[in-house]
Amino acid sequence: VDRFEQNEKTPVTEGICLLTVVSPRRDEGNSPTGIVGRCLARQLLAMGRRVRVMAEPDQCDDWPDTVDVVEGSITRPLECARAFEGVEAVFLAGAHPSTVQDALVLARNAAASKVVVLSSHGPEYEEAYPPETWFWLAIEKAVERSGIAWTHIRPSAVMGAVIEGTYPATGSDWPDTLRADGVVREAFLNQGHYPFIHEADLAAVVAAALTSDDYTGTVIEAVGPPLSTLSRIRSIAAALGRDIGAVDLTADESRAIWRRLDWPDGAIDVTLYALEEYGARFAELVQWTLDQRPSVHDIIGRPLRTYDDWVGENIDSFR
């Protein structure tokens, strides 16, 4: 049990935590804010925190009863300024560089004491390019200059992204194809690897950053180990109790399939690059994951949930 999943009768003694949630996005580096946000809301409530959610229209349902849901978009924060009233901490997910400053002004006016950014592994690459081209790094820099205590979280791909339909492209069509003909068709099936983290583990990292000063002013690499494509397929097959066919495609063939599924070229490029890179440099990148401090294990106080765990919880999506 997470150290952040305590007795649900814990008394409420803290201010409001505002979580921002947007519709599923397929651009590279995006995490499924709805799935992560719902895990986070449950964990914060179990800690005795008050939770408010600013959610885009298609994300307003299926929250715990005690969550205060306000319809609005963090990409247009001035249209929903009331969501910031009385807020102590903000989980900033789905923000846009063009309007993030408006959100930070509202947070500062509300006397918010902390902003935790759901970022990406893009900033370390964006640094090599002119500031006007930045996306993730622009958001991080704006938060750092806001005068509010901050933490940036750069996660691996989230296991639940396949359910919400967000980045990465690998695995995104598996529920449909497995229901249709029981065959997975992707590039780099044999050597491809991709790093994943369970959404509940990522939420526990966020909960720690929101409710503790231990991680203020730090960048947390919330990374899970690289998983081979074949191991993910085998996990699903074992849970289904049947074999799953696998056809290894060329990168161009995989690209064509993902384009037909409306994936943007940027997300496809990054997915293919990562599958190949993590496969070719597996030992090195596993070591990089193990070397990160604080580790996810350190922060949440238990081993990370596995892909087998996730599949067991979500197997109906593949039936």
Identify the role of each PLM range.
Residues 3-4, 10-59, 64, 75-78, ...:
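Oxidoreductase cofactor-interface core, primarily capturing Rossmann-like NAD(P)-dependent enzymes
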Residues 72:
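Cofactor-binding loops of NAD(P)H-dependent oxidoreductases
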Residues 89-93, 117:
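Redox-cofactor binding/interface segments in oxidoreductases and associated redox assembly factors
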Residues 93-107, 272, 278-281:
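N-terminal glycine-rich "phosphate-gripper" loop used for MgATP/nucleotide binding
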Residues 220-221, 248, 270-275:
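Short catalytic/ligand-gating loop segments at beta-alpha or beta-beta junctions
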Residues 236-242, 248-251, 263-266:
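SDR active-site lid
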Residues 253-319:
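A hydrophobic C-terminal alpha-helical subdomain
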